[in-house]
């Protein structure tokens, strides 16, 4: 086949330009990426060979070889993994079929340390070769096929693909033509040091070919780290494994290395990152826990190994009870896998509960990073909601710190049986909301919910350990009776309603269909009015979210609660007693103000502005 010259995808061209003109200080990460790719290639073929043994006939011992060729100025990485044919080379090296490249470019921060981590996270690690090489030559033969193909590029917008007559066994060889200014990478001592730094956890043996002695030296132990005893593994080895597996620059916050024995046997080596992962809420996010069966890599995609709300976990799970020849499709609804998932979930939640109690400051940082994802589990039917709620923390309006639901309950006032919350986008704005001023004045705490998911999970978790979870926007909250009997409360409610009937009727008459009802508030202490919803109605913030998502068309009419102790409301009431009904514009302004404070749209902004101007004008003249 004659040579075919092709242009890189535009996005790949941007990546190449970035790598070629890289200012990254840690350029040796190219070795981490290429070794990781070679290991993946061996893992893929090992898996396929369980059902197609002929693919590894005559060469079933997988290995990776690294060679420094000083005479020709090359670093060569060779594996006997699955290999690539012409189509694979074009798809994998010439284009990015997935959204990885675009996301990579979008997430670049300008911080070289963080951007180094992104290189591997977004699947563009191969291109890091151009940090140190001015030309890259890839020779490959796919397992089960005879033809050998060569891919070559200088990284300047195009590449060449051609067939080759070279005698070449299965696998892939990457030859990096090292830049003159990067020739220190040809030094054997440095090469071996770099490979050892990034490879000890790799389960495939990695050899260094010493051209002087004409022999190969194994550089890694080639035993999967998770199969070793914890006492044999240093903290540094755990960290390096985590960083290589996760393409991370941070250290893990929590390391869980456990061997589960009994009815179901498996080993897990799991990490909770100390920094927020870039794709936590990305639509194309992946769960990054790899499944192995008897040390054979099976998959890290499309398997239900961990619940979605624990997707921040990194690591591996190695099962002894699943058959090696199981298909990926069969893993979707597998009883053994479901038991492993349940055991891991229980273990992780137990570890989080311990951390919450023992290291609250560290836990606050974890929660800021991953709490939003964790709370998604409260919306899932299969979740043990109470166990999950035990590890949730929320901002306390009364104490201005993060507390758990159990801590909130310990702070109940005498006779209190309800957990109050208020949801919104900004905790500072929530603190000044009229909805909670009465509760706080009585030292009744309110939890501030600021994640979108909060509005969903409270709809399916209306209580915790026998205590009702209630929004402070509900109409039936009476701060004076919050810790008293319902019988006393009903008597006082009737008295207030009768006493101020003329006031509420007047507001109803003026506002008409803009309100569902007008009531005397039992929760306001200083503000003139607030919007509220009945017990059965949708929470105000939840309704607003559904309108934004076009799930419902229009906002429903809300109740308007009035504070008779407020001077403005008192003035309107006294005017009514004097048969003066000339406060229509003031009534409308009070309603508009209540809407604004709740984040609701004002029906007529022009009229609102005029009313406000008129009142200000009267005040200064």
Curated annotation (Swiss-Prot):
SUPFAM superfamilies: ATPase domain of HSP90 chaperone/DNA topoisomerase II/histidine kinase, HSP90 C-terminal domain, Ribosomal protein S5 domain 2-like. It is found in: Cytoplasm. GO terms for molecular function: ATP binding; ATP hydrolysis activity; ATP-dependent protein folding chaperone; unfolded protein binding. It comes from the Bacteria. Residues 486-498 have a biased composition (Basic and acidic residues). Residues 478-498 are annotated as: Disordered. Residues 329-544 are annotated as: B. Keywords: ATP-binding, Chaperone, Cytoplasm, Nucleotide-binding, Stress response. GO terms for cellular component: cytoplasm. Disulfide bonds: none annotated. The keyword Chaperone applies. The keyword Ribosomal protein does not apply. Residues 545-621 are annotated as: C. Its main location: cytoplasm. NCBIfam families: PRK05218.1. Molecular chaperone. Has ATPase activity. Belongs to the heat shock protein 90 family. This is Chaperone protein HtpG. It comes from Rickettsia bellii (strain RML369-C).
